[in-house]
Amino acid sequence: DVYKRQVESSYNGGWYGQCKVIREYLPSTDLPALIENYLLINTDKNPMFVEIPVINNRLYTDPRKGVDGSYLIEMKIDRNGYFSIQPGDTLSFSAYITGYKKGQPALVINGQQEKLKRIEAVTSWMDNLVLETPDPIIDRMFAFSKIRACESIYETQGGPMHGPGGESYYAAIWANDQAEYINPYFPFTGYAVSYT
């Protein structure tokens, strides 16, 4: 599945019960956010009791390293409390990390809505400019390249820019890459952000 990353694990807590945890990791398609959706499934024959703490961690980045000074990084969980999960039932919740410039209002993230938006975006990229060769590995590599290309567009002071990434140079240009390879490719993806 090209639009989500899912990790599944099992937990046997002895007297506390058994459960399965499914975690999905995804970036927001239009917000400065990374989302983690959790499903906690009671695989035991007895009810399971779970406490989700209130989490609202905030930190500020070094103002000398930001274009606009210090940024606020916020980590939250959208659900908290004490829950009883019956055998076979599922408890779902989301955690997310967001980033803000000074003075920007806080975001309220709905993890399931973000997942649906991502599925829609990636599906549209996969439906456009499809490579079909005798080798399914090459076809899959090309499909993944569309995700990599479309998700490497960053908002800069000069407007949206495609960049190589690399953790230090997000708003940098590798001129030959942009001019020779990616810019002619973008209109065929159908992703309006890439060519407007």
Language model segments and positions:
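Substrate-binding groove/exosite segments of carbohydrate-active enzymes
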Residues: 123-195
